[in-house]
Structures are given as C-alpha cells and as structure tokens.
From Swiss-Prot:
Protein name: Ipsdienol dehydrogenase
List of residues binding substrate: 149
Predominant place of localization: cytoplasm
Single GO term (MF): oxidoreductase activity, acting on the CH-OH group of donors, NAD or NADP as acceptor
Binding positions for NAD(+) per the UniProt entry: 12-40, 63, 166
Family: Belongs to the short-chain dehydrogenases/reductases (SDR) family.
Reactions catalysed according to its record: (4R)-ipsdienol + NADP(+) = ipsdienone + NADPH + H(+); (4R)-ipsdienol + NAD(+) = ipsdienone + NADH + H(+)
Gene transcribed to yield this protein: IDOLDH
Enzyme category, top tier: oxidoreductase
Organism annotation: Ips pini (Pine engraver beetle)
Length: 253
C-alpha cells in the first residue's frame, strides 16, 4: 500500500538550502503542500497556495510553534515533518591536538543544540498535530523523517560534536518510532554520507577542490535530489519505520 504524497501537507525544516530545499521542491512537484521553515526567508517559484515560508530557528520553541500554527492556518492539517535542519562547523573537537588545549565550547554547544536539541524540539512539538488526522488504510496519521549521518553510525574524530549529535538522532528516531507506533506515527532517519551542499562546501572550504571528496561508489558526492528521492521512497513505503536509511555509496565502514 503506497502512501500518497499529492495533497499531503509537510513541514520541511532547513528548507532554504541543501537537502531541505531539494526535499521541499520534490514534495511540491509531487503535488504536496509544504511549509518551508528556515533561518532565512525562502523565495520560491511555486504557487502561493501550495507553499508557505516561515523564518525561524529549530532551537526556538516559539518559532517552531509559530511555523506549525501557520501551517494549520494555511493548509488545515499536517501530515509529516521532514527535519533537515542542521549544522557542521570547523573546530568541532573536544581537544585540539595541535594546541593541546580544550576545544571551543561555543562551537560544540552550537552544533549540539542545533542538531540534537533542535530535533527534539521539532519532533515533540509536531506530534500533537498528527493526532487529529484521520488514519489512512494502514492506520497512519503522520510521519517524521529526521536527518542523521553516516558519522552517527561511525563517528569522525575530527567532528566530535557533529558525530555525537547525529548518533543521538539515530537513537531518538528509533525510540520515538517504538513509542508512537500505537498512535499511527512513523519515525525514520536518513543517514547520508558526503553531500554536495552549501554546508559541506563551507565546512571543507571553497578554496579546496570539491572533487577530492567522494563516496566509494558512485565515486562522487551525493546530490541533494538523491536525498529528496530517499524521503519520497520512505513516505511511500509504510513498512519503513524505526530504522536508519543509509544513503552513503558504501562509504560507511
């Protein structure tokens, strides 16, 4: 039994660029109505009655509540959350091997609060909105797809806070899927490897040759549309629930 995307309503966090933008565009192309939640105002080419742009921070309870309420006011319901917002920063280390000094606490805190606490915040606030939905033929009332990473499965010593936050998202998604199963709500995470996104390019430095970074096979970076296609596949496949969907070109150890 395939879940229909057309006429469904989704909130996409981090929808202003990268994986989130590609996800929002694909869902809109498939006939969904989408609220794009981003730190920056998003300007789109889709009809006004199909898309809503809300500026805010996933760490802010009031911002997320405002986005959810705006979604209900405009579209009348919420069928799913595609949580793509996240950060990756240079200097992500608990201990600097060169200076023999502790890592920058501000950097570590920003990564963990955005990636992990932002995921907690969006997930917890969205759940009540699913409960008023009429269940489909499978009994589903809603779906959450979080964005983790291959580094959540195999941590990088050069990105300690990022890896830790992504591992926690994997655990959160599975635990939440089990808890919400009796309510008809699915929860998944997608664990991509190296992606060709503005965030990744900023992290490695625009002056470096991006071609030096690649997954095993295909030997290139993941394109955002490939992540979006994985989102579409998960939405349309009801039995995908409580697992980490690894999109990595065999890069994981």
């Amino acid at each position: 039994m395939m879940v229909k995307i057309q006429d469904s309503v989704y909130l996409v966090t981090g929808g202003g660029s990268g994986l989130g933008e590609a996800t929002a565009k694909l869902l809109l192309t498939e006939g969904a109505r989408v609220t794009i939640f981003s730190r920056n105002e998003y300007k789109n080419e889709f009809p006004h009655d199909q898309v809503l742009s809300v500026k805010g921070d996933v760490r802010s309870e009031s911002d997320v509540k405002r986005a959810l309420e705006a979604t209900i006011q405009k579209f009348g319901k919420l069928d799913g959350v595609m949580h793509c917002a996240g950060v990756f920063q240079n200097g992500d280390e608990l201990f600097n091997m060169d200076t023999q000094q502790p890592g920058d606490y501000t950097v570590l805190t920003d990564i963990v609060t955005t990636n992990l606490l932002g995921t907690f915040n969006v997930n917890r606030l969205a759940i009540p909105y699913f409960l008023t939905n009429q269940p489909d033929e499978e009994g589903q009332k809603g779906i959450i797809i979080n964005c983790s990473s291959t580094s959540g499965h195999s941590p990088m010593s050069s990105a300690v806070a990022y890896s830790t936050s992504k591992a926690a998202i994997i655990g959160l998604s599975y635990a939440l899927a089990k808890q919400l199963s009796t309510l008809g709500i699915r929860v998944m995470d997608i664990a991509p490897a190296l992606c060709d996104t503005p965030m990744f390019r900023r992290a490695v430095g625009f002056n470096q040759d991006i071609a030096n970074f690649r997954n095993l096979f295909p030997a290139r970076l993941i394109q955002p549309i490939e992540y979006a296609n994985a989102v579409k596949h998960i939405i349309e496949t009801p039995m995908l629930n409580g697992s980490s969907y690894q999109l990595d070109g065999a890069l994981r150890p």
